Amino acid sequence: MIDQYKHQQLRIGLVSPQQISAWATKILPNGEIVGEVTKPYTFHYKTNKPEKDGLFCERIFGPIKSGICACGNFRIIGDETEEPKFCEQCAVEFVDSRIRRYQMGYIKLACPVTHVWYLKRLPSYIANFLDKPLKELEGLVYCDFAFARPIAKKPTFLRLRGLFEYEIQSWKYSIPLFFTTQGFDTFRNREISTGASTIREQLADLDLRTILDSSLSEWKEGPTGNEWEDRKVRRRKDFLVRRMELAKHFIRTNIEPEWMVLCLLPVLPPELRPIIQIDGGKLMSSDINELYRRVIYRNNTLTDLLTTSRSTPGELVMCQEKLVQEAVDTLLDNGIRGQPMRDGHNKVYKSFSDVIEGKEGRFRETLLGKRVDYSGRSVIVVGPSLSLHRCGLPREIAIELFQTFVIRGLIRQDLASNIGVAKSKIRENEPIVWEILQEVMRGHPVLLNRAPTLHRLGIQAFQPTLVEGRAICLHPLVCKGFNADFDGDQMAVHVPLSLEAQAEARLLMFSHMNLLSPAIGDPISVPTQDMLIGLYVLTSGNRRGICANRYNPWSRKNYKNEKWNDHNYKYMKEPFFCNSYDAIGAYRQKRINLDSPLWLRWQLDHRVVASREAPIEVHYESLGTYHEIYGNYLIVRSVKKEIIFIYIRTTVGHISFYREIEEAIQGFYRACSYGT
């Protein structure tokens, strides 16, 4: 489907029988209408040609070879002077053979058949619409019991018995005895309704607007006051909400409920269910062909029974209708009703649902997962030194992705006379190649995608940089948007080629522009997993307490009893530092550990200090100054009790974390001031 903006899209939904017929029907020049598949045959065993009106019929689906009919006649495709467009003998149209990839056929079912997706899948749409238990509807569809229905509001033979099951076994045998075969057929059509035709009649009688109004009025009813009754009311209201949403969807999309019961069964184009000849002359066929054959066989049998209904017992007709329903169920979803159908080698047939669902299905493997040019794939690893909008590309991947641009750069700078010379320089890994590659990558973003792409943040743009190794380096903060982690996940990298694609990547898709979740608006670039553990280790410190650190001999490994003459650090149980640079320098020289408690001179508000907290210890100096030691800070006072210095008790990890936060806030303010 192509919308008004020329965007190609695919939509799956219910269609009317008229639409199915329009997809498959063709009118020949002689007035004959083709499109219905009536025979369960594929290819003739002698001529190896498709059987007429079979599953591979050239009249219905188009010629196998372009411009050549079944008789062997040839016409030039697209030549307006060539007449006629159809072969007069075999009625095959002279068109391109690619028509067999999209030209459909149909099977006219002898009885209505419910679509098993809408009956058996949970929630059951048919059960929701009819407001009846699923088990009850299944028994009705598969002819296990029947409805007694009044005609034109007149009393029936069954006295409005309603839904009845053959619990009284005499009902099965008394009705045929009271009526002749012909009379039983008339009686059943007038008095009894069973099979999918009953479901279709009830769905056709539904008024979606009435369902909305009645469900809404029932939903507005208040509680009864009884606890058990209120629980039933809540469950009923949940069901009514689902029913109203379903009715709104059908109204909005112009879908009729009776379309969930099939009268015409679409037949896939033959190229989507091929028969391939392998070594030894053997044929390998798609499982769907065998399932289609089973449907046609049973449908033709039912058609024959109905044409000779005057001599056919009604029970036999009902049994055959059940077989047709089961055959269509197996075609659409094998095994949904229990034991799946198997071939002679005890292998389960792949139904239509098996073909399209899952990772190896038609959608994810063929439509969504197609291989494209200018793309690569590799395992992701953490790159903590990268900026948020950058990613690290291995040299091997980068030179392949940007090889065309590198060749153009070599030729423009007169470093290579032609493409062959440029490729040889690339193969030899000359230094100039990597310089040109870095220039190319500096102005060219790349797209990273992690399957499955479930929302917008599943694919984001990054500025690439060259890294060693064979893995893609990624900033850990962008992993949540991709739902990725570093336990072996793989990502695909794509190169946007057109100027429009590059502009879209830069303006809309860069990772530092997608910091909020598009669904709920919460921040999505938040620390998770390894980062949380790292922040915990960085800021945990030694939590045994100030007294334990001072008097526990096992905790003194971080600060030995010796003077550091080169920095003139005065040792007092825990080291003192005038600024954070000295503390980090001592850590880099391995004089203290990351979680070593230390005293850092700090500018602290005096109002915070002027509290009623009593000091743990007070150390007096010979000159009259003294130190008041509290739990998390230390005050140096003069003889006049004036505050000279204030130290806070911290660790190198806390200092590093604080500096990173401070730099980030300052960068944010600079960016805001630059933007205004």
Swiss-Prot record:
GO cellular component entries: chloroplast; DNA-directed RNA polymerase complex; mitochondrion
InterPro entries per UniProt: DNA-dir_RpoC_beta_prime, RNA_pol_asu, RNA_pol_N, RNA_pol_Rpb1_1, RNA_pol_Rpb1_3_sf, RNA_pol_Rpb1_clamp_domain, RNApol_RpoC1
Comment on bound cofactor: Binds 1 Mg(2+) ion per subunit.
Origin superkingdom: Eukaryota
EC number: 2.7.7.6
Major enzyme class: transferase
Entry's transmembrane regions: none
rRNA processing is among the record's keywords: no
Single GO biological process annotation from the record: DNA-templated transcription
Gene Ontology molecular function: DNA binding; DNA-directed RNA polymerase activity; magnesium ion binding; zinc ion binding
Plastid in keyword set: yes
Cofactors demanded by this protein: Mg(2+); Zn(2+)
Residues engaged in binding Zn(2+): 69, 71, 87, 90
A Pfam family this chain is assigned to: RNA_pol_Rpb1_2
The reaction(s) this protein catalyses: RNA(n) + a ribonucleoside 5'-triphosphate = RNA(n+1) + diphosphate
Keywords: Chloroplast, DNA-directed RNA polymerase, Magnesium, Metal-binding, Nucleotidyltransferase, Plastid, Transcription, Transferase, Zinc
UniProt subcellular location: Plastid, Chloroplast
Chief site of localization: plastid
Known function: DNA-dependent RNA polymerase catalyzes the transcription of DNA into RNA using the four ribonucleoside triphosphates as substrates.
Subunit structure: In plastids the minimal PEP RNA polymerase catalytic core is composed of four subunits: alpha, beta, beta', and beta''. When a (nuclear-encoded) sigma factor is associated with the core the holoenzyme is formed, which can initiate transcription.
HAMAP family: RNApol_bact_RpoC1
PANTHER family hit by this protein: DNA-DIRECTED RNA POLYMERASE (PTHR19376), DNA-DIRECTED RNA POLYMERASE SUBUNIT BETA (PTHR19376:SF54)
Protein name: DNA-directed RNA polymerase subunit beta'
